[in-house]
């Protein structure tokens, strides 16, 4: 949350680093929106966030739809398993890019590939595989400068944007780069969802092959680059410091 205690990091340095993180975070968020829309076309329950899945589980149990309830429970457990895998692979609360992120991305790509094959064959076992990929992605991104970076749902993003705007109205200083960062993630998720619906209408579950391939290739490149030390992901990105502001006094 933007109002939590920030990590002890120089604001200008934080801004320079977030410029490197923004493209990846936007792609993550767009991928989650795409995957969630595609999965919704197969089974009317979200896989990128668990609030809707838990509600669907309760509805199915009440209606006595045991097969659907089992699928909903599998989605929830799959998401949990993905977060568990991220905890084992990445093992950090704070955002520290390294080779393990490349491995985690390749695992996510493998899970989406598995889900693509299963869903194309009409097997619901593809649903927990998709949810596991989303849980893995959501847990890969973590805390940075007081922001909880989550890329598979937008409830937290909208909450944080609202809180920051409220602080601004109350004449409290806010960091505009954080607000822009959250707005980019929100927009990316929506655009990804829109593209996902179009792809699902045309290709069905096979559309999941696109993010599966993207995650696999991106993970391999990330691992290679960090393994060979070819680039410092946290190098200086520019001279502009972060801008802060508060609601103008009357």
Question: What residue ranges belong to the model's regions?
Answer:
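Alpha-helical transmembrane segments of multi-pass membrane proteins
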Residues: 2-250
């Amino acid at each position: 949350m933007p109002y939590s205690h920030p990590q002890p990091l120089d604001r200008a340095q934080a801004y320079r680093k977030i410029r490197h993180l923004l493209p990846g975070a936007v792609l993550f968020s767009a991928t989650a929106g795409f995957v969630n829309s595609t999965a919704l076309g197969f089974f009317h329950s979200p896989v990128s966030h668990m609030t809707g899945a838990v509600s669907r589980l309760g509805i199915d149990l009440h209606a006595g739809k045991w097969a659907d309830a089992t699928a909903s429970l599998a989605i929830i457990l799959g998401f949990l398993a993905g977060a568990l895998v991220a905890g084992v692979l990445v093992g950090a609360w704070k955002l520290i890019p390294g080779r393990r992120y490349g491995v985690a991305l390749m695992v996510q790509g493998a899970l989406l590939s598995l889900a693509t094959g299963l869903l194309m064959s009409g097997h619901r076992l593809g649903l927990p595989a998709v949810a596991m990929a989303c849980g893995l992605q959501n847990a890969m991104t973590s805390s940075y400068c007081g922001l909880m970076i989550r890329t598979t749902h937008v409830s937290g993003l909208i909450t944080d944007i609202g809180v920051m705007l409220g602080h601004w109205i109350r004449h409290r200083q806010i960091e505009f780069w954080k607000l822009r960062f959250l707005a980019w993630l929100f927009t990316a998720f929506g655009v990804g969802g829109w593209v996902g619906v179009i792809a699902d209408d045309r290709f069905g579950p096979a559309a999941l092959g696109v993010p599966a391939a993207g995650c696999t290739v991106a993970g391999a490149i990330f691992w290679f680059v960090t393994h060979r030390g070819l680039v410092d992901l946290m190098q200086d990105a520019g001279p502009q410091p972060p801008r802060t502001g508060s609601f103008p006094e009357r």
